[in-house]
Amino acid sequence: MGSVRVEDFELVNVEVPDLKEEGDFLVRNIWMSVDPFLRIYMTKGTKHAPPFELNKSLEGGCIGKVIESKSSKFKVGDYVKANFGWRKYWIGKETQSEEKSISKVNSTLGPLRSFLGLLGITGITAYVGLFKICNL
């Protein structure tokens, strides 16, 4: 297994394709999550998901802003949270919203980065563990 090293990663520039279909929208990532569970997917994966593929972008939580849209659900200027991970831009489709956990973020509730921590799955996990299981 070994430790993850800088040499294990590569920064690659790719062309961002044009939006082709109704329901497509282009997002520029602002925040990306680096969670401990990602380490599992760098080796063997789990019963819930296969390991990361070599020479592909790492998947994981991200917060971004819709900068172009052919979607009635996700409009230019909307902030969204998804599992598209480590990339500067990504194209989402309305039909992927459940599969890739794409959802709008209400930026008035707190700093955007909070939706990957305190207001995200890690915050919910901590809350349930402390207050529902440990009864604190």
Task: Name these PLM-found stretches.
Residues 1-2, 53, 78, 105:
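Intrinsically disordered, low-complexity boundary segments flanking structured domains
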Residues 1-3, 45, 113-114:
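Extended, compositionally biased low-complexity polar/Lys-Gly-rich tracts
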Residues 2-15:
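Short glycine/threonine/proline-enriched tight-turn/helix- or strand-capping micro-motif at secondary-structure
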Residues 12-34, 42-86:
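Glycine-rich beta-strand-centered segment in the early N-terminal region that forms part
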Residues 39:
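Beta-strand acidic-aromatic groove motif in beta-rich domains, primarily in extracellular
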Residues 58-65, 76-136:
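NAD(P)H dinucleotide-binding glycine-rich loop of Rossmann-like/cofactor-binding domains
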